[in-house]
Amino acid sequence: MRRDFRIFALAGIGLTAACATVPAPGDPAVPVYAVAETQPVVTANEDAADDPAIWRNAAAPADSLIVATDKKAGLYVYDLGGQPQSFTAHAALNNVDLVDMEDQGIVVFASDRSDLAQARIALFRLDTASGSLVELGSVASGPGEAYGICG
């Protein structure tokens, strides 16, 4: 009886040890610190600054631009130092993304949440020379709330 208990106890310890998690292989975590920060958006204290998309200038990386939302007021374009280059007023935009369409330029997409029943995607072209946005219009994206974009 005592021998059976020992076998059962050893088996239990072995099974418990097999359940231990093993850290995932990979490089250790490295802290990343900001070297620049944007000023608070127009609608301060409203949890409105959100969702940046970065256009990387391959020819001159320091001239890359960031497009980000002020969910209550519109879209900002920032330089990499966090300085605003332009602002496009347009209430209720969120979930911004951009795509390099080569000859057609950089197209910026943002979910237009001004009509929660009929979702739309607002479209802009990013003028990379001036750091401004040119509104192209919007397209319907189906019934319901426009909350994100799948590329």
What positions do the PLM features span?
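Sequence/structural signature of beta-propeller domains
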Residues: 20-151
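C-terminal motif of bacterial Sec signal peptides marking the signal peptidase cleavage site
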Residues: 16-18
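Bacterial N-terminal signal peptides that target proteins for export
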Residues: 1-9
